[in-house]
Amino acid sequence: MLLAAALLSGCGAATPASAQPVETPEPSEEIVIYRGEAEMDLSDKSPDELRQCLPELSNLKEAKLNADTLSAEELGELQALRPDVRFLFQVTLNGKTCDPETEKLDLTGASRKTMREAFAWAAYLPKLKSLELGEGDAADNSIPWAELAKLRAERPDLRVKYEFTLYGQEFSLDSEEMNLTHIPMDDQGALVKAVTDCMPKLRYLDMDSCGVDDEHMAEIRDAHPEANVVWRIWFGDTLEGRAGYSVRTDVDRILASNPGIGGELTPENTKSLKYCTKVKYLDLGHNSYMSSIDFVRYMPDLEATVLAMGNWSDVSPLASCPKLRYAELQTTCINDLRPLARLKNLTDLNLCYNFALHDISPLYEMTQLKRLYLGMYTPVPAEQVAELQRRIPGCEINTTTDNPTDGQWRYTAVTPYGNELAPAYEWLREVMRYEEAPGSYAYSYNDPLY
């Protein structure tokens, strides 16, 4: 009779007269379980007693609880245990009695402790529509931001009203844009992250030159995939009086092919380029110390790139750029073209002066190719060139030029009025803004937003 005794003590010694005992025979003893009615007052039961008896009350549909002896977390556990039961309770939050029918809750002026408790209970007030927090300064530590963020994640339908200042600027939790550019921050953006985690409508955050490093900015960005989070990166060599390069992470064009001013690009000083995920046009040519282009795999919108005259060999990052149509990859250490085979939009490809390249068969199925420049020094078997020409008869394949950009790669004719540009190269010059150089280079002093 031990189980029967536990259930009787846990769920009320007085069984309703209408309840009939259900006998469950056991080989050695008889156990009687009272399953109760559809509605029960369990306000005198402790959380442990409730956890014990609720699974046995199979007819229960509604139960009254005592919030004075129950935490919001424990209520959540009971709801998970019996999601089919409606739990009734009353809890005092900031001096106001709240229950499952409460629709509005005003926490204006409440202490941080009270707010933390209220946020926990608000998740279990199903009809709560509006939560008022008043106004204040985001930095005064009055709002428990982590708990509020948790509530907003659990109750995205809940309208939370709070007007606040952040670094001297005015916002609300419903703000869609936040411009904090050039405001020095000494906490690696921790306060901004805490606040913006509570702003579900945020779509634009500008933190250009705020002193927050790339890794912490990336954490803020990753927490808001629906928003455009922008900051400034630096790459290249700033030693020996060089300017280096600097761009905002939302740029669509980067021209950094002048190591004499920007410094030589290396794997170490180009890591930050991976945060420029909106780049369409990229020219990093003439950087002989650049032995990796791994950052390119984070540029899915890339359409044109010049990565010539580098010391890199792994072309696989370009496989993550499905929109790529123009690529100058001459004078590198490329030895395997297989990753390029999936680039169905690539039409103009320059592979001249690639002495480690001996196999172009991965290009056989790239029937969209219009121009392939191998030049006279890329050691590709003649039979492969012939086979590629047979498969793609409309492709211009050059195996004779001794200069990667000669032939008709850049110019199709010389006239009394100047050189006639090849259409693809003319497009490249336009999107890269070569005519505006040096003003089009990615030097910080060329950026009006710096």
Listing of model-derived features with the role each one plays in the protein:
Residues 32-49, 59-70, 82-149, 153-214, ...:
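Concave beta-strand-loop units of leucine-rich repeat
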Residues 25-29:
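N-terminal export/targeting and maturation segments
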Residues 1-5:
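Sec-dependent N-terminal signal peptides
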